[in-house]
């Protein structure tokens, strides 16, 4: 009855997507009827996803609490909200509330943010949808990856302006684990962008008081540079 499920939505059923006659027997479903309980969800998908292919009532339940009932998990395009579809997969997992693991519930993606619940970076800008939402960005706009929301870039060429190539972009903030709304994530007095540019750790406040390149001076001529003789990273920045 060809009631397997095309899980990758590529238009064909691979061997691991078939709901074989043996599985029909094990699930007590009808081998000649694709949807034994007539609930609009094919037996193979229900069995694969841990639902009951003999219970028509589970079509309107939401076991994972993500805001999508099972019939909408089975085919997201039934929703009709105009959400973005990136990877062509229109089925979410009915027992997992965040199918793509981006930090947003499947229902939130479809009804609130109009993002793709099976692809964790809808605008493909390198920043996951959930992270963008967390910090107030638009998960459907790739341009915000290139901006510098908190202005923690630096005027390296001393032109009196921070040009785009001197930005510490939102994408860099994500990749380095820094806060794109706070120019100094570790509160050490040095902007995140400057720390990353010079190989410091923007999440470690202690590197502000270190003399990374050893360019302090032994003012008291005692054979070592110590204490207030160091030229710290914070002083280098200042």
Put a short name on every predicted segment.
Residues 1-238:
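Extracellular calcium-associated, cysteine-rich motifs in secreted modular proteins
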């Amino acid at each position: 009855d060809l009631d397997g499920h095309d899980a990758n939505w590529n238009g064909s059923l691979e061997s691991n997507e078939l709901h074989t006659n043996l599985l029909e027997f094990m699930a007590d479903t009808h081998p000649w009827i694709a949807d034994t309980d007539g609930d609009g969800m094919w037996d193979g998908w229900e069995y694969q996803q841990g639902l009951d292919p003999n219970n028509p009532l589970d079509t309107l339940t939401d076991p994972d609490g993500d805001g999508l009932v099972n019939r909408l998990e089975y085919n997201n395009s039934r929703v009709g909200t105009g959400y973005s579809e990136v990877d062509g997969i229109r089925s979410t997992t009915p027992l997992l509330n965040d199918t793509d693991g981006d930090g947003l519930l499947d229902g939130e993606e479809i009804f609130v943010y109009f993002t793709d619940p099976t692809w964790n970076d809808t605008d493909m800008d390198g920043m996951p949808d959930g992270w963008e939402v967390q910090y107030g960005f638009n998960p459907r706009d790739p341009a915000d990856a290139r901006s510098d929301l908190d202005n923690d870039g630096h005027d390296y060429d001393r032109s009196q302006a921070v040009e785009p190539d001197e930005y510490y972009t939102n994408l860099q903030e994500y990749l380095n684990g820094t806060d794109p709304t706070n120019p100094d994530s570790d509160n050490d007095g040095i902007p995140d962008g400057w720390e990353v540019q010079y190989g410091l750790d923007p999440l470690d406040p202690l590197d502000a008081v270190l003399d990374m390149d050893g360019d302090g001076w032994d003012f008291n001529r005692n054979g070592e540079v110590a204490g207030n003789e160091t030229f710290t990273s914070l002083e280098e920045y200042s």
